Amino acid sequence: GKTQRVIVPFALVDTGLRWHVRAYDRKHGDFRDFVISRIEAPKLLDEAPQAHELAENDIQWTRIVELSLVPHPRLARPEIVRMDYGMSGDSLQLRSRAAVAGYMLQRWGVDCSPDHRLTDEPYRLWLADPLTLYGVESAALAPGYQPPQA
């Protein structure tokens, strides 16, 4: 349903499917993503953000994760994927903000399961070390990702 919120936006994010705004949500007291097309009748408030609402305090935004993507192990011709993605060796090294890593992995169709179990055609890449997503809140969006068992 509809809710009213006061947010403190600081970044626009293109997920490849839609635009989001990254903002501090005063209602919940944390940083979140908001789909721009779902925001109705926005109003600009004449207020300065409080210190804890600034982007530098968003751990998921300031954290950079190093992702190592490799051709999916099920592929008979991994060299084609290496060529398609311009891999200089056996992997493609990417850096992403933790806040958007899940969106990126979803958009790129990266199998993030620990045992590369997603075998459908769209999954041409596999995340070589799914533990790199530990503590990344957006990892829930990454195809096949499973949080480590305690």
Protein language model regions, located:
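Polybasic (Lys/Arg-rich)
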Residues: Q60-A150
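Core beta-strand-centered patch of the WYL/Sm-like small regulatory domain
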Residues: G1-S88, P148-A150
